[in-house]
């Protein structure tokens, strides 16, 4: 399928039709960069979905964090249920890179916990890019980090057609080359089992289906997809392509060639270290590298094989690493959401990684070629990026300098107007805020309060609580999943006021919030820049009674610019409403939708109709299963029980266990 099928009951309205037309026109005209300047609640994601549907190109959507990526994934999945919408984020629940601290002579081994489900989703994403034209990949900045070369990866794939002549032993050897393991008892992802002339293979990138190959002598008599849990055959297949378990799988001949290059570099580096009288470093480097070489010779891989990626990909020294961008076709589209945050992230990754690796090389823990296992530099990213649309309510300087066209979407189809802004004296800000909170609470509306310091947030929360206000404080120690649950409870009315510092400037929508209070708005700085103020004020833009109060004793340049831009948008929306006879309507969004990013590929619905939206999370703050490692441990325990129940033919109990696993995976997606 190469057509994008946009499924929605809405038609573009307000500024959307013109924005969509201009963006499509710009792409067709070959503009390298465009900016969609869209206010909160104007339907920017819907506009981008319409653009993708019209231009019919594979699209990479870059979000600034996993929470927003999960939300976008859920939205695009709903817009394009019949197309390949995939999720590509870092698969580490926990990651401690290897490092050396010379001052204390401390070496910290690499330690990581890999999320098996997200690893499967990453493999599924690259498969979609390689096989389909109708792919939308939602990603984070992890897309600029090194990945196996697509050329090498494609050389490893295994094609099986019905009617092929196929020796069973040769097939099993090929599966071993793909790093699949044989397991006749516990059938899991990236494993296979053999029962006479029947070979069952669980593809590494699949969470829904396994593949059954039935041989008659040395001919493939039948190929079918089946449910690995129940064994039910889903459909017959004419052919199937098996992809490697890892993006770093390398053909044997490439591996042998790479090992020769590593040996040459090792010899040169040892000579250099010995000439500098660094005998300990030389001995350490030789021992570590020779161990890695032996592992690669025997197993085809080693721990930390990515540090030899220069040789495995055949790229010269200093060349950019292969990344997800190398998997994109030439006509792809890049959409950068919240670009004022995302673009600076891309530029920040390289330097921190470089300084850590230089220390490892200097003290003999790694060869100098390990420096080429790195994220892309900003200039390299610019060179490889396809046609780009920046999406933001407050575009940054980079977008302003590079956008060939700025497309405005400041009119909301709902007719909602930007919040009215009031400036009140900072001297009496706390008492004034308290009276405003009581007014809003009486109307069952919610309030966001943003402060400058953690101490002030804590003190303000205590003060409000002492005066009978139902209040919670959102701080950096709260993990992503619980943060989403707190926002959910704010919307449900479990409490009325949420206090924070860098509070929800970009992210989840809360139509129930009618007041945003910004304390000490006249203190110039990152948290009170014009962009920060506009983003924070925008949190009240989805409520009919939306209002923002800036507590300040003077008007700063940032305040002036933020107020001016908000007023400009208000005037444009009011004029549009008058012209079209629109009466503003509040946004009523189902509270469950806040978790829409947690729609998990792999949750099987009872009717087996593709991906199902997982069940709602309960709105309580659980004392257990807070950290990703705890959730993962619980998932593994439940999976063992589920497969045991399936082996015992207790399929109803296994299905209940599967649904519970689906709920836990929802939580992991947003972490």
Curated annotation (Swiss-Prot):
SMART domains named among the record's database cross-references: DEXDc (SM00487), HELICc (SM00490)
Segments forming domain Helicase C-terminal: 429-582
UVR domain residues: 632-667
UniProt keyword terms in alphabetical order: ATP-binding, Cytoplasm, DNA damage, DNA excision, DNA repair, Excision nuclease, Nucleotide-binding, SOS response
Bias kind Basic and acidic residues: ranges: 614-625
Location of the region described as Disordered in the Swiss-Prot/TrEMBL record: 601-625
Annotated residues for binding of ATP: 38-45
Places the protein is found: Cytoplasm
Beta-hairpin, short sequence motif: residues: 91-114
CDD domains xrefs: DEXHc_UvrB (cd17916), SF2_C_UvrB (cd18790)
Sequence similarity: Belongs to the UvrB family.
Subunit and interaction comment: Forms a heterotetramer with UvrA during the search for lesions. Interacts with UvrC in an incision complex.
PANTHER family with a match to the protein in the record: UVRABC SYSTEM PROTEIN B
Protein role: The UvrABC repair system catalyzes the recognition and processing of DNA lesions. A damage recognition complex composed of 2 UvrA and 2 UvrB subunits scans DNA for abnormalities. Upon binding of the UvrA(2)B(2) complex to a putative damaged site, the DNA wraps around one UvrB monomer. DNA wrap is dependent on ATP binding by UvrB and probably causes local melting of the DNA helix, facilitating insertion of UvrB beta-hairpin between the DNA strands. Then UvrB probes one DNA strand for the presence of a lesion.
Protein name listed in UniProt: UvrABC system protein B
UniProt source species: Pseudomonas syringae pv. tomato (strain ATCC BAA-871 / DC3000)
């Amino acid at each position: 399928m190469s057509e994008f099928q946009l499924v929605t009951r809405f038609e573009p309205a307000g500024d959307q039709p013109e924005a969509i037309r201009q963006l499509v026109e710009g792409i067709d005209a070959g503009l390298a960069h465009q900016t969609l300047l869209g206010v909160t609640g104007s339907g920017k994601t819907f506009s981008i979905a319409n653009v993708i549907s019209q231009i019919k190109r594979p699209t990479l959507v870059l979000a600034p964090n996993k929470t927003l990526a999960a939300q976008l994934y859920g939205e695009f999945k709903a817009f394009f249920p019949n197309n390949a919408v995939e999720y590509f984020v870092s698969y580490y629940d926990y990651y401690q890179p290897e490092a050396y601290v010379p001052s204390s002579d401390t070496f910290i081994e690499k330690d990581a916990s890999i999320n098996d489900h997200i690893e499967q989703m990453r493999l599924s994403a690259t498969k979609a890019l390689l096989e389909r034209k109708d792919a939308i990949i939602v990603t984070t900045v992890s897309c600029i980090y090194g990945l196996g070369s697509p050329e090498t990866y494609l050389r490893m794939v295994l094609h099986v057609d019905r009617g092929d002549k196929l020796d069973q032993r040769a097939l099993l050897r090929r599966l071993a080359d793909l790093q699949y393991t044989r397991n006749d008892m516990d059938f899991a992802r990236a494993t296979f089992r053999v029962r006479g002339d029947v070979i069952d293979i669980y593809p590494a990138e699949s969470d829904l289906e396994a593949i059954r190959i039935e041989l008659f002598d040395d001919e493939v008599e039948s190929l079918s997809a089946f449910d690995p849990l129940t064994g039910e055959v889903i459909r017959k297949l004419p052919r199937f392509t098996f992809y490697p378990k890892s993006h770093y799988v390398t053909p044997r001949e490439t591996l042998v060639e790479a090992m020769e290059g590593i040996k040459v570099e090792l010899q040169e580096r040892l000579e250099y270290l010995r000439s500098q009288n660094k005998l300990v470093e030389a001995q350490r480097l030789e021992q570590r590298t020779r161990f890695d070489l032996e592992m690669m010779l025997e197993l085809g891989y080693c721990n930390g094989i990515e540090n030899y990626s220069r040789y495995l990909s055949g790229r010269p020294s200093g060349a950019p690493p292969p990344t997800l961008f190398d998997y994109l076709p030439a006509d792809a589209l890049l959409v950068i959401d919240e670009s004022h945050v995302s673009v600076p992230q891309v530029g920040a990754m390289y330097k921190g990684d470089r300084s850590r690796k230089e220390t490892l090389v200097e003290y003999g823990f790694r060869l100098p070629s390990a420096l080429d296992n790195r994220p892309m530099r900003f200039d390299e990213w610019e060179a490889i990026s396809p046609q780009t649309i920046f999406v933001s309510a407050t575009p940054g300087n980079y977008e302003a300098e590079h956008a060939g066209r700025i497309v405005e979407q400041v009119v909301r189809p709902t007719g909602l107007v930007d919040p009215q802004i009031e400036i009140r004296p900072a001297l009496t800000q706390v008492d004034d805020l308290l009276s405003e909170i009581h007014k809003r609470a009486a109307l069952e509306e919610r309030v966001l309060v943003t402060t400058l310091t953690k101490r002030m947030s804590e003190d303000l929360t205590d003060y409000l609580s002492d005066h009978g206000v139902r209040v919670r404080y959102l701080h950096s120690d709260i993990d992503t999943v619980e943060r989403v649950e707190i926002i959910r409870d704010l919307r449900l009315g479990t409490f009325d006021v949420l206090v924070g510092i860098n509070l929800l400037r970009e992210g989840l929508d809360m139509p129930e919030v009618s007041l945003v209070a910004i304390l000490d708005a006249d203190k110039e700085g990152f948290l009170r820049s014009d962009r920060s103020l506009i983003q924070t004020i925008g949190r009240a833009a989805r409520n009919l009674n939306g209002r923002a109060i800036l507590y300040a004793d003077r008007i700063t340049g940032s305040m002036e610019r933020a107020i001016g831009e908000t007023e400009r948008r208000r005037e444009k929306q009011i004029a549009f409403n008058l012209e079209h006879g629109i009466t503003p309507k509040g946004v009523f969004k189902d509270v469950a939708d806040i978790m829409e990013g947690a729609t998990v590929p792999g949750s099987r619905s009872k009717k087996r109709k593709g991906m199902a939206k997982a069940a709602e999370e309960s709105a309580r703050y659980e004392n257990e299963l807070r950290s990703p490692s705890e959730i993962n441990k619980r998932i593994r325990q439940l999976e063992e029980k589920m497969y045991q129940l399936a082996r015992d033919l207790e399929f109803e109990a296994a299905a209940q266990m599967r649904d519970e696993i689906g709920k836990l995976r929802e939580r992991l997606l947003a972490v």
